Amino acid sequence: TDMVGLDINYNWFTRSMTFEDLFFNYRPTNILWRTMYNQIYTANGVVSTIDPATEDSSLKYYLAQALSIRAFDYFVLAQMYQHTYKGNESKPCVPLITNENANEAAANGCARSTVQEVYDQIMSDLNKAVSLLEATDKTRGTDKRYISKEVAYGLRARVNLTMQNWTAAAEDAQKAINGSGTPYSREEAGAPGFTESSDHSWMWAIVIAETDRVVTSGIVNFPSHMGSLNYGYASVGAWRMINKKLYNEIPDTDVRKGWWLDANKHSDNLNATQVAQATKYGCPAYTQMKYGPYKGVMAQSTNASDIPLMRVEEMYLILAEAQAMGGNPSTGAATLQKFVNDYRDPAYVCTASSATAVQDAVWQQRRIELWGEGLSYFDILRLNKGIDRRCLLYTSPSPRDR
Protein backbone atom coordinates (compact mmCIF):
# COMPACT_ATOMS: atom_id res chain seq x y z
CA THR A 1 0.00 0.00 0.00
CA ASP A 2 1.24 3.51 -0.78
CA MET A 3 -0.40 5.60 1.95
CA VAL A 4 0.17 4.99 5.64
CA GLY A 5 -1.67 6.29 8.68
CA LEU A 6 -1.11 5.80 12.38
CA ASP A 7 -3.47 3.66 14.47
CA ILE A 8 -5.64 6.46 15.80
CA ASN A 9 -8.78 5.58 17.74
CA TYR A 10 -10.29 9.05 17.39
CA ASN A 11 -13.85 10.07 16.57
CA TRP A 12 -15.05 8.39 13.35
CA PHE A 13 -11.86 6.34 13.13
CA THR A 14 -13.26 4.14 15.92
CA ARG A 15 -15.32 2.03 13.51
CA SER A 16 -12.29 1.42 11.32
CA MET A 17 -10.17 0.40 14.29
CA THR A 18 -12.73 -2.25 15.25
CA PHE A 19 -13.29 -3.36 11.63
CA GLU A 20 -16.93 -2.35 11.83
CA ASP A 21 -16.74 -0.06 8.80
CA LEU A 22 -17.08 -2.95 6.34
CA PHE A 23 -20.83 -3.46 6.66
CA PHE A 24 -23.39 -1.96 4.30
CA ASN A 25 -25.10 0.09 6.99
CA TYR A 26 -22.03 1.94 8.27
CA ARG A 27 -21.01 5.44 7.22
CA PRO A 28 -17.89 4.74 5.11
CA THR A 29 -19.77 2.33 2.87
CA ASN A 30 -22.92 4.45 2.83
CA ILE A 31 -21.04 7.61 1.88
CA LEU A 32 -19.54 6.08 -1.25
CA TRP A 33 -22.70 4.26 -2.38
CA ARG A 34 -25.09 7.12 -1.71
CA THR A 35 -22.86 9.81 -3.16
CA MET A 36 -22.51 7.95 -6.44
CA TYR A 37 -26.18 7.00 -6.73
CA ASN A 38 -27.39 10.46 -5.67
CA GLN A 39 -25.32 11.94 -8.49
CA ILE A 40 -26.63 9.29 -10.87
CA TYR A 41 -30.19 10.20 -9.83
CA THR A 42 -29.55 13.85 -10.62
CA ALA A 43 -27.84 13.01 -13.90
CA ASN A 44 -30.76 10.79 -14.92
CA GLY A 45 -33.09 13.72 -14.33
CA VAL A 46 -31.08 15.94 -16.64
CA VAL A 47 -30.77 13.27 -19.33
CA SER A 48 -34.51 12.61 -19.28
CA THR A 49 -35.26 16.33 -19.61
CA ILE A 50 -33.06 17.23 -22.60
CA ASP A 51 -33.89 16.02 -26.09
CA PRO A 52 -30.81 14.07 -27.27
CA ALA A 53 -31.35 15.50 -30.77
CA THR A 54 -31.34 19.11 -29.56
CA GLU A 55 -29.53 21.68 -31.67
CA ASP A 56 -29.27 24.12 -28.78
CA SER A 57 -25.59 24.58 -27.93
CA SER A 58 -26.17 25.14 -24.21
CA LEU A 59 -28.42 22.10 -23.89
CA LYS A 60 -25.84 19.95 -25.65
CA TYR A 61 -23.29 21.12 -23.09
CA TYR A 62 -25.52 20.37 -20.10
CA LEU A 63 -26.50 16.96 -21.47
CA ALA A 64 -22.81 16.16 -21.87
CA GLN A 65 -22.21 17.11 -18.24
CA ALA A 66 -24.90 14.71 -17.03
CA LEU A 67 -23.73 11.83 -19.23
CA SER A 68 -20.11 12.32 -18.18
CA ILE A 69 -20.92 12.41 -14.48
CA ARG A 70 -23.11 9.32 -14.76
CA ALA A 71 -20.29 7.50 -16.52
CA PHE A 72 -17.78 8.62 -13.89
CA ASP A 73 -20.03 7.44 -11.05
CA TYR A 74 -20.65 4.03 -12.57
CA PHE A 75 -16.94 3.64 -13.29
CA VAL A 76 -16.16 4.24 -9.61
CA LEU A 77 -18.89 1.83 -8.51
CA ALA A 78 -17.85 -0.86 -10.99
CA GLN A 79 -14.26 -0.75 -9.74
CA MET A 80 -15.30 -0.82 -6.09
CA TYR A 81 -17.89 -3.59 -6.18
CA GLN A 82 -16.42 -6.15 -8.56
CA HIS A 83 -13.05 -7.29 -9.83
CA THR A 84 -11.52 -5.46 -12.77
CA TYR A 85 -13.15 -5.57 -16.18
CA LYS A 86 -10.90 -7.98 -18.05
CA GLY A 87 -11.74 -11.60 -17.30
CA ASN A 88 -14.76 -10.71 -15.17
CA GLU A 89 -17.16 -9.42 -17.81
CA SER A 90 -19.98 -11.83 -16.92
CA LYS A 91 -19.79 -11.38 -13.14
CA PRO A 92 -22.45 -9.39 -11.26
CA CYS A 93 -21.60 -5.73 -10.83
CA VAL A 94 -23.87 -2.95 -9.52
CA PRO A 95 -27.53 -2.10 -10.25
CA LEU A 96 -27.66 -0.14 -13.49
CA ILE A 97 -30.24 2.62 -13.14
CA THR A 98 -30.63 5.11 -15.98
CA ASN A 99 -33.34 7.52 -17.05
CA GLU A 100 -34.91 4.64 -19.00
CA ASN A 101 -35.58 2.35 -16.02
CA ALA A 102 -35.50 4.77 -13.08
CA ASN A 103 -39.24 4.63 -12.38
CA GLU A 104 -39.31 0.84 -12.56
CA ALA A 105 -36.29 0.62 -10.25
CA ALA A 106 -37.92 2.97 -7.74
CA ALA A 107 -41.06 0.85 -7.66
CA ASN A 108 -39.65 -2.67 -7.80
CA GLY A 109 -35.93 -2.43 -7.17
CA CYS A 110 -33.16 -3.24 -9.62
CA ALA A 111 -31.05 -6.37 -9.88
CA ARG A 112 -27.29 -6.21 -10.39
CA SER A 113 -26.14 -5.88 -13.98
CA THR A 114 -23.07 -7.66 -15.26
CA VAL A 115 -19.68 -5.99 -15.48
CA GLN A 116 -20.02 -5.95 -19.26
CA GLU A 117 -23.40 -4.25 -19.12
CA VAL A 118 -22.14 -1.57 -16.75
CA TYR A 119 -19.06 -0.85 -18.86
CA ASP A 120 -21.18 -0.77 -22.02
CA GLN A 121 -23.30 1.94 -20.39
CA ILE A 122 -20.21 3.85 -19.25
CA MET A 123 -18.74 3.85 -22.74
CA SER A 124 -22.06 4.74 -24.35
CA ASP A 125 -22.42 7.74 -22.05
CA LEU A 126 -18.85 8.91 -22.62
CA ASN A 127 -19.07 8.51 -26.39
CA LYS A 128 -22.24 10.60 -26.44
CA ALA A 129 -20.71 13.18 -24.12
CA VAL A 130 -17.61 13.53 -26.29
CA SER A 131 -19.73 13.98 -29.41
CA LEU A 132 -21.86 16.63 -27.72
CA LEU A 133 -18.85 18.54 -26.38
CA GLU A 134 -17.20 18.45 -29.79
CA ALA A 135 -20.41 19.83 -31.33
CA THR A 136 -21.11 22.69 -28.91
CA ASP A 137 -19.52 26.12 -28.87
CA LYS A 138 -20.32 26.56 -25.18
CA THR A 139 -17.26 26.19 -22.95
CA ARG A 140 -16.67 26.15 -19.22
CA GLY A 141 -14.20 29.03 -19.34
CA THR A 142 -11.92 28.86 -16.30
CA ASP A 143 -14.41 27.00 -14.10
CA LYS A 144 -12.92 23.53 -13.79
CA ARG A 145 -15.91 22.14 -11.91
CA TYR A 146 -17.37 21.42 -15.32
CA ILE A 147 -16.32 18.80 -17.83
CA SER A 148 -14.62 20.00 -20.99
CA LYS A 149 -14.10 17.78 -24.00
CA GLU A 150 -10.51 17.24 -22.80
CA VAL A 151 -11.80 15.95 -19.46
CA ALA A 152 -14.24 13.69 -21.30
CA TYR A 153 -11.33 12.35 -23.35
CA GLY A 154 -9.46 11.81 -20.09
CA LEU A 155 -12.35 9.93 -18.51
CA ARG A 156 -12.68 7.74 -21.58
CA ALA A 157 -8.92 7.16 -21.57
CA ARG A 158 -9.20 5.87 -17.99
CA VAL A 159 -12.00 3.49 -18.92
CA ASN A 160 -10.28 2.29 -22.08
CA LEU A 161 -7.11 1.63 -20.07
CA THR A 162 -9.10 -0.50 -17.61
CA MET A 163 -10.79 -2.36 -20.47
CA GLN A 164 -7.37 -2.86 -22.11
CA ASN A 165 -8.44 -1.01 -25.23
CA TRP A 166 -4.87 0.16 -25.63
CA THR A 167 -5.07 2.00 -28.94
CA ALA A 168 -8.21 3.88 -27.91
CA ALA A 169 -6.70 4.73 -24.51
CA ALA A 170 -3.60 6.18 -26.17
CA GLU A 171 -5.68 8.19 -28.65
CA ASP A 172 -7.88 9.66 -25.91
CA ALA A 173 -4.91 10.46 -23.67
CA GLN A 174 -3.18 12.27 -26.53
CA LYS A 175 -6.33 14.27 -27.31
CA ALA A 176 -6.58 15.24 -23.64
CA ILE A 177 -2.93 16.34 -23.62
CA ASN A 178 -3.31 18.34 -26.82
CA GLY A 179 -6.12 20.48 -25.41
CA SER A 180 -4.86 20.88 -21.84
CA GLY A 181 -2.20 22.83 -19.99
CA THR A 182 1.32 21.64 -19.30
CA PRO A 183 2.34 19.57 -16.27
CA TYR A 184 3.81 21.24 -13.21
CA SER A 185 7.44 22.16 -13.85
CA ARG A 186 10.16 20.81 -11.55
CA GLU A 187 10.28 24.20 -9.86
CA GLU A 188 6.51 24.27 -9.32
CA ALA A 189 6.49 20.69 -8.05
CA GLY A 190 9.32 21.53 -5.67
CA ALA A 191 7.13 23.18 -3.04
CA PRO A 192 3.95 22.24 -1.14
CA GLY A 193 0.97 23.05 -3.34
CA PHE A 194 -1.89 21.22 -5.05
CA THR A 195 -4.49 23.61 -3.67
CA GLU A 196 -5.71 25.69 -6.65
CA SER A 197 -7.86 24.47 -9.54
CA SER A 198 -6.51 27.38 -11.59
CA ASP A 199 -3.11 25.67 -11.78
CA HIS A 200 -2.28 24.94 -15.42
CA SER A 201 -1.82 21.19 -14.92
CA TRP A 202 -5.29 20.69 -13.41
CA MET A 203 -7.97 19.51 -15.84
CA TRP A 204 -10.92 18.84 -13.52
CA ALA A 205 -11.51 19.64 -9.87
CA ILE A 206 -13.88 20.07 -6.98
CA VAL A 207 -13.77 23.84 -6.59
CA ILE A 208 -14.21 24.97 -2.99
CA ALA A 209 -15.30 28.39 -1.70
CA GLU A 210 -14.55 29.69 1.80
CA THR A 211 -18.29 29.95 2.49
CA ASP A 212 -19.02 26.32 1.60
CA ARG A 213 -20.33 24.19 4.44
CA VAL A 214 -17.47 21.75 3.97
CA VAL A 215 -15.14 24.61 4.95
CA THR A 216 -17.19 26.25 7.70
CA SER A 217 -17.51 22.83 9.37
CA GLY A 218 -13.87 23.29 10.33
CA ILE A 219 -12.32 19.85 9.94
CA VAL A 220 -14.71 17.81 7.80
CA ASN A 221 -12.86 18.41 4.54
CA PHE A 222 -10.03 17.18 2.33
CA PRO A 223 -7.25 19.50 3.61
CA SER A 224 -8.07 18.56 7.19
CA HIS A 225 -7.21 14.95 6.41
CA MET A 226 -4.49 15.45 3.80
CA GLY A 227 -2.79 18.64 4.95
CA SER A 228 0.22 18.47 7.25
CA LEU A 229 0.77 22.22 7.65
CA ASN A 230 -2.81 23.35 8.30
CA TYR A 231 -5.26 22.75 11.13
CA GLY A 232 -7.27 19.54 10.99
CA TYR A 233 -7.31 15.83 11.68
CA ALA A 234 -3.70 15.43 10.55
CA SER A 235 -2.43 17.93 13.11
CA VAL A 236 -3.89 15.86 15.97
CA GLY A 237 -2.16 12.69 14.82
CA ALA A 238 -4.01 11.43 11.74
CA TRP A 239 -0.94 11.95 9.57
CA ARG A 240 -0.84 10.81 5.97
CA MET A 241 2.50 9.20 5.22
CA ILE A 242 4.14 7.29 2.40
CA ASN A 243 5.18 3.66 2.55
CA LYS A 244 8.86 3.69 3.52
CA LYS A 245 9.79 1.15 0.84
CA LEU A 246 8.18 3.24 -1.90
CA TYR A 247 9.85 6.39 -0.56
CA ASN A 248 13.27 4.73 -0.62
CA GLU A 249 12.73 3.78 -4.27
CA ILE A 250 12.39 7.45 -5.30
CA PRO A 251 15.77 8.75 -6.55
CA ASP A 252 17.31 11.72 -4.77
CA THR A 253 17.35 13.52 -8.13
CA ASP A 254 13.54 13.37 -8.33
CA VAL A 255 11.91 16.58 -7.08
CA ARG A 256 8.95 14.52 -5.82
CA LYS A 257 11.09 12.98 -3.07
CA GLY A 258 10.51 16.24 -1.23
CA TRP A 259 6.76 15.60 -1.25
CA TRP A 260 7.41 13.67 1.98
CA LEU A 261 9.69 14.05 4.98
CA ASP A 262 12.63 11.66 5.03
CA ALA A 263 13.71 9.42 7.92
CA ASN A 264 15.21 12.49 9.62
CA LYS A 265 12.01 14.53 9.11
CA HIS A 266 13.61 16.67 6.41
CA SER A 267 12.39 17.73 2.97
CA ASP A 268 14.35 19.79 0.47
CA ASN A 269 11.05 21.26 -0.74
CA LEU A 270 10.29 23.19 2.47
CA ASN A 271 11.26 26.77 3.27
CA ALA A 272 12.15 27.93 6.78
CA THR A 273 8.56 28.85 7.69
CA GLN A 274 7.26 25.46 6.56
CA VAL A 275 10.03 23.63 8.40
CA ALA A 276 9.14 25.50 11.59
CA GLN A 277 5.46 24.56 11.23
CA ALA A 278 6.21 20.89 10.57
CA THR A 279 8.47 20.86 13.61
CA LYS A 280 5.87 22.60 15.77
CA TYR A 281 3.19 20.09 14.77
CA GLY A 282 5.58 17.19 15.33
CA CYS A 283 5.16 15.69 11.87
CA PRO A 284 6.63 12.16 11.86
CA ALA A 285 9.09 10.83 9.31
CA TYR A 286 7.57 10.14 5.88
CA THR A 287 4.67 12.56 6.45
CA GLN A 288 3.37 14.08 3.21
CA MET A 289 4.32 17.64 2.26
CA LYS A 290 2.77 17.45 -1.22
CA TYR A 291 -0.40 19.30 -0.21
CA GLY A 292 0.23 22.77 1.11
CA PRO A 293 -2.17 24.83 3.26
CA TYR A 294 -4.82 27.07 1.70
CA LYS A 295 -3.20 30.22 0.29
CA GLY A 296 0.11 29.06 1.78
CA VAL A 297 -0.83 30.21 5.30
CA MET A 298 0.69 28.01 7.99
CA ALA A 299 -1.69 26.48 10.58
CA GLN A 300 -4.54 27.63 8.36
CA SER A 301 -7.98 26.73 9.75
CA THR A 302 -9.85 27.90 6.65
CA ASN A 303 -9.49 24.67 4.70
CA ALA A 304 -10.83 25.89 1.36
CA SER A 305 -8.31 24.21 -0.93
CA ASP A 306 -9.65 22.84 -4.20
CA ILE A 307 -9.48 19.09 -4.78
CA PRO A 308 -7.91 17.63 -7.93
CA LEU A 309 -9.97 15.09 -9.87
CA MET A 310 -7.78 14.95 -12.98
CA ARG A 311 -4.39 16.39 -13.88
CA VAL A 312 -2.70 16.34 -17.26
CA GLU A 313 0.24 14.41 -15.79
CA GLU A 314 -2.02 11.35 -15.57
CA MET A 315 -2.67 11.56 -19.31
CA TYR A 316 1.06 11.25 -20.08
CA LEU A 317 1.22 8.14 -17.91
CA ILE A 318 -1.86 6.62 -19.56
CA LEU A 319 -0.32 7.37 -22.96
CA ALA A 320 2.96 5.65 -22.07
CA GLU A 321 1.27 2.54 -20.68
CA ALA A 322 -1.19 2.26 -23.56
CA GLN A 323 1.56 2.64 -26.15
CA ALA A 324 3.62 -0.09 -24.51
CA MET A 325 0.78 -2.54 -23.99
CA GLY A 326 -0.60 -1.78 -27.46
CA GLY A 327 2.49 -3.25 -29.11
CA ASN A 328 5.08 -0.46 -28.93
CA PRO A 329 7.04 -0.88 -25.68
CA SER A 330 9.97 1.22 -26.90
CA THR A 331 7.62 4.10 -27.73
CA GLY A 332 5.93 3.78 -24.34
CA ALA A 333 9.28 3.75 -22.56
CA ALA A 334 10.39 6.84 -24.48
CA THR A 335 7.15 8.67 -23.63
CA LEU A 336 7.57 7.81 -19.96
CA GLN A 337 11.23 8.82 -19.82
CA LYS A 338 10.63 12.13 -21.59
CA PHE A 339 7.78 13.01 -19.21
CA VAL A 340 9.83 12.25 -16.09
CA ASN A 341 12.98 13.94 -17.47
CA ASP A 342 11.14 17.09 -18.50
CA TYR A 343 9.04 17.57 -15.38
CA ARG A 344 10.34 15.56 -12.41
CA ASP A 345 13.78 13.93 -12.61
CA PRO A 346 16.35 14.87 -15.29
CA ALA A 347 18.44 11.80 -14.42
CA TYR A 348 15.65 9.23 -14.84
CA VAL A 349 16.23 6.41 -17.32
CA CYS A 350 13.50 3.92 -18.20
CA THR A 351 15.37 0.65 -18.69
CA ALA A 352 12.24 -1.45 -19.27
CA SER A 353 12.05 -3.09 -22.69
CA SER A 354 9.07 -5.46 -22.63
CA ALA A 355 5.48 -4.26 -22.63
CA THR A 356 4.74 -5.51 -19.12
CA ALA A 357 8.01 -4.11 -17.79
CA VAL A 358 7.12 -0.68 -19.15
CA GLN A 359 3.65 -1.06 -17.63
CA ASP A 360 5.26 -1.71 -14.25
CA ALA A 361 7.55 1.30 -14.71
CA VAL A 362 4.50 3.45 -15.44
CA TRP A 363 2.74 2.03 -12.40
CA GLN A 364 5.70 3.03 -10.23
CA GLN A 365 5.47 6.57 -11.58
CA ARG A 366 1.71 6.63 -11.03
CA ARG A 367 2.24 5.57 -7.41
CA ILE A 368 4.53 8.56 -6.90
CA GLU A 369 2.95 11.22 -9.12
CA LEU A 370 -0.70 10.57 -8.25
CA TRP A 371 -0.17 9.78 -4.56
CA GLY A 372 -3.14 10.94 -2.50
CA GLU A 373 -5.34 11.63 -5.53
CA GLY A 374 -7.65 8.62 -5.28
CA LEU A 375 -6.25 6.41 -8.04
CA SER A 376 -3.78 4.07 -6.33
CA TYR A 377 -6.32 1.50 -5.13
CA PHE A 378 -7.97 1.34 -8.54
CA ASP A 379 -4.56 0.76 -10.14
CA ILE A 380 -3.92 -2.16 -7.80
CA LEU A 381 -7.26 -3.69 -8.81
CA ARG A 382 -6.79 -2.98 -12.52
CA LEU A 383 -3.29 -4.45 -12.62
CA ASN A 384 -4.12 -7.36 -10.30
CA LYS A 385 -1.40 -6.34 -7.88
CA GLY A 386 -1.52 -7.44 -4.28
CA ILE A 387 -1.61 -4.98 -1.41
CA ASP A 388 1.68 -5.33 0.47
CA ARG A 389 1.30 -3.86 3.95
CA ARG A 390 4.90 -4.33 4.99
CA CYS A 391 7.11 -1.26 5.56
CA LEU A 392 4.13 0.61 6.96
CA LEU A 393 5.93 2.14 9.94
CA TYR A 394 3.86 0.49 12.65
CA THR A 395 4.97 -2.00 15.27
CA SER A 396 4.19 -5.56 14.22
CA PRO A 397 4.90 -8.96 15.79
CA SER A 398 6.74 -9.92 12.59
CA PRO A 399 9.59 -8.11 10.80
CA ARG A 400 8.17 -5.30 8.69
CA ASP A 401 11.13 -4.46 6.48
CA ARG A 402 11.27 -7.61 4.42
Residue ranges and their predicted role:
Residues T1, G5, N25-N221, G237, ...:
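Acidic/polar-rich alpha-helix caps and helix-coil junctions
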Residues L6-F19:
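Cytochrome P450
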Residues M17-R27:
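Acidic/histidine-rich, surface-exposed loop or edge segments in extracytoplasmic proteins
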Residues H225-A238:
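Short, cationic low-complexity segments
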Residues K244-K245:
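Short hydrophobic "helix-edge" motifs at membrane interfaces and signal-peptide entry regions
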